[in-house]
């Protein structure tokens, strides 16, 4: 029996062998086999990485932005060269289907190239002064050392979402991947090492969030911590960062509503909502978690929805290419989904499809449709993060908007209608960072991914996401 590979960290331009005794097993969620081990890193490891990033930052910032962009393009080229290898790692450690893993890797390379294009485009300002002979200059400066704490659902892309704008604008970064999906991050670090990126500009630390994450947020040398994860984890990061008044950028949970109007294209709505719910086995914070259907089409829509969900195939993504879903990430995730469905049933919901975990190896949960659901049920308010879809009927658009907004979360929302006036009313009424009209919930790199309320602070992507990594210096120049 082969011994699982033991991965090192990447600090100050070197792969660092772990000298500690404690290791964390990385498990294939499709088979429950241990596929690798990573160090159970401690705060001291994070401090070393932060110190390396601090040493490297002034010289990195001094480079012209276009030169920093050229390094990003070398990274994206390396990703494309290793695309098949990286996709396989994502499938193995994350349970993601092959097609989605391939999309994630390709999108990551494209995203890095997109951010590199901003090298000549982010600007300061010259402002008219009230004083004779004075110029007011606004410069955009790097923050300094930044840190990125990643989730496991889109682990490879999230490296780029934090690293690319940080490095492009003259910051350095320390990345901590999820302990459930670290192998793809090791592959990323190997690319960084192979292209010869200056030491300390990019660092990778491995371990648990509750130990390393606290140092990445609480170290006084850190200028900004960017985290993607749960609300509870975000609260801890925010509290720790507050001790040094450190800037935070948080993308947290979601409970995305999808509103289906009487005049909707039902074929489009059903396909988009099902695709949005089963993608990555429902483990996506911005995809539809609850559906509101106007009463005039409720029966017809629910019948079509049930047929579409029944047709969804799932299994081991390493063995099958004809599936739309793999397993959930781990045993704890499977148990949480089971508990949320059980509670919904206790509160009066009816399981129309699915509703029971699959027996045997792997953390599989089938597409599940819940009917006879009421707005006050917990399943309409708590994030499920699994392939479970509760459906509620409504009379008027105003009622649907009111129920959609009745949430602690405010990340994404969607509406299906062929009436422009209805769509515009929904856009104005829905209190979410993103609203999708007649399409699945998946953002664009040139947009801005940002949640309201408990879904987060700050945002990512596009011009506005780039500016999260900049601070403004004002100069009053009297001649």
Each model region followed by its residue ranges:
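Glycine-rich loop-to-alpha-helix module at the N-terminal edge of alpha/beta enzyme cores
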Residues: 33-122, 133
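Rossmann-like NAD(P) dinucleotide-binding subdomain of oxidoreductase/dehydrogenase enzymes
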Residues: 124-268, 322, 394
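Short, well-ordered beta-strand elements within core beta-sheets of diverse protein domains
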Residues: 35-41, 56-62, 147-148, 258-261, ...
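Hydrophobic face of amphipathic alpha-helices that form TPR/SEL1-like repeat modules
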Residues: 1-30
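Residue-level signal for inorganic ion chemistry
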Residues: 32, 68, 90, 112, ...
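Conserved C-terminal structural/oligomerization subdomain of aldehyde/semialdehyde dehydrogenase
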Residues: 31-37, 222, 259, 357, ...
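ALDH superfamily catalytic-core signature
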Residues: 232-374, 437
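Structural signal for hydrophobic packing residues in well-ordered secondary-structure cores
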Residues: 57, 61, 76-83, 87, ...
């Amino acid at each position: 029996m082969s011994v699982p590979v033991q991965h090192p960290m990447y600090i100050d331009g070197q792969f660092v062998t772990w000298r500690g005794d404690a290791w964390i097993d990385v498990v294939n969620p499709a088979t429950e086999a241990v596929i690798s081990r990573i160090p159970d890193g401690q705060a001291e490891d994070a401090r070393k990485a932060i110190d390396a990033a601090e040493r490297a930052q002034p010289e990195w910032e001094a480079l012209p932005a276009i030169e920093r962009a050229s390094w990003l393009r070398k990274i994206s080229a390396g990703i494309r060269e290793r695309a098949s290898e990286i996709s396989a790692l994502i499938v193995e450690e994350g349970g993601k289907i092959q097609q989605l893993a391939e999309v994630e890797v390709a999108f990551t390379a494209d995203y890095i190239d997109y951010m590199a294009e901003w090298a000549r485009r982010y600007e300061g300002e010259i402002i008219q002064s009230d004083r004779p002979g004075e110029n007011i200059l606004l410069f955009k400066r790097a923050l300094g050392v930044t840190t990125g704490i990643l989730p496991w659902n889109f682990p490879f892309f999230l490296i780029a979402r934090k690293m690319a704008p940080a490095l492009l604008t003259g910051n350095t970064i320390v990345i901590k991947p999820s302990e459930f999906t670290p192998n793809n991050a090791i592959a990323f670090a190997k690319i960084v090492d192979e292209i010869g990126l200056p030491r300390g500009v990019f660092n990778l630390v491995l371990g648990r969030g509750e130990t390393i994450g606290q140092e990445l947020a609480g170290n006084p040398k850190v200028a900004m911590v960017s985290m993607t994860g749960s609300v509870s984890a975000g609260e801890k990061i925010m509290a720790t960062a507050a001790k040094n008044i450190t800037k935070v950028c948080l993308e947290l949970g979601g409970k995305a509503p999808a509103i289906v109007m009487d005049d909707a294209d039902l074929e489009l709505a059903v396909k988009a909502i099902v695709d949005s719910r089963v993608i990555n086995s429902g483990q996506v914070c911005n995809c539809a978690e609850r559906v509101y259907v106007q009463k005039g089409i409720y029966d017809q829509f629910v019948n079509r929805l049930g047929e579409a969900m029944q047709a969804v195939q799932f299994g081991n993504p390493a063995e099958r290419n004809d599936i739309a879903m793999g397993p959930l990430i781990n045993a704890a995730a499977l148990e949480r989904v089971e508990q949320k469905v059980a509670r919904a049933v206790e509160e009066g919901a009816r399981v129309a499809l699915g509703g029971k975990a699959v027996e045997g190896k792997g953390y599989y949960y089938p597409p599940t449709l819940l009917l006879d659901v009421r707005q006050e049920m917990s399943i309409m308010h708590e994030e499920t993060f699994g392939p479970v879809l509760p459906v509620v009927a409504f009379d008027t658009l105003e009622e649907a908007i009111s129920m959609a907004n009745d949430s602690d979360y405010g990340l994404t929302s969607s509406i299906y209608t062929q009436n422009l006036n209805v769509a515009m009313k929904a856009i104005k009424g829905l209190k979410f960072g993103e609203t999708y009209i007649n399409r699945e919930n998946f953002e664009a790199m040139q947009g801005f991914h940002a949640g309201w309320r408990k879904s987060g602070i700050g945002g990512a992507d596009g011009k506005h996401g780039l500016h999260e990594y900049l601070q403004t210096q004002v100069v009053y120049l009297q001649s």
